[in-house]
Amino acid sequence: MNLQEAINKRHSVREYERKIIPKKILIELIKDASKAPSAKNEQNYKFYIVNSKKKRDIVAKYLKSTLKLMNKQINKLEENLKKVLINFYSDLGGAQTIIFVYRKKIKNSPEYQFPNDLAGISCAIENLMLSAVSRGLGTCWIGSFKEPKIEKDLNKLMNVKEDEELITSILVGYPKKGYKPLIRKKKKLKEIIKFI
């Protein structure tokens, strides 16, 4: 699969086969993520990969608990989308692997005040997602674990150092056979581009 095919094929997957991804493939995903550009080549990120059933099930419970926090937003959605999200948040959509992306806190540093390292992290995540697509995997970027109590519990579960902070998480897995992604309308090019 070439790059353009991977870009066009990539979408959020919210239903997965209950199949473990081999560690070798996960390492390849992180290797590809680490090739992304970052300001001053700092690569201020660390990937915590939850790939064991026991810890995965604990993480699934954490995500399910965020449904209560999002109740108002979910109730505003149309019925089919509401059903998809409730199922997704109830069991990670069946995904067996969750990758948590952390960064090292850099206190009293100008870089900490500006989003340079966040841009680098985002580039790394996109590399990871495109790499996953090229290997027949699906991904879904989720930020719901940033709720303070859940983040604290996650840090304890994964033995995260105090000088690291959670940025986001990505589910990775084999898309469920017959899965049809939600069709999300993208902005028209004229809305996001301006030639000067």
Predicted regions and their residues:
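Short coil/turn connectors at secondary-structure junctions
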Residues: 94-97, 137, 162-166
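Short, conserved beta-strand edge motifs with alternating hydrophobic and charged residues
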Residues: 48-50, 99-102
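C-terminal helix-cap and adjacent tail motif
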Residues: 3-13, 86, 165-196
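Helix-biased detector of long, well-ordered alpha-helical tracts
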Residues: 17, 86, 102-110, 193
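Small-aliphatic-rich amphipathic alpha-helix that forms the alpha element of a beta-alpha
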Residues: 33-34, 99, 105-154
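N-terminal amphipathic, basic helical "cap/leader" segment at the start of enzyme domains
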Residues: 1-94, 196
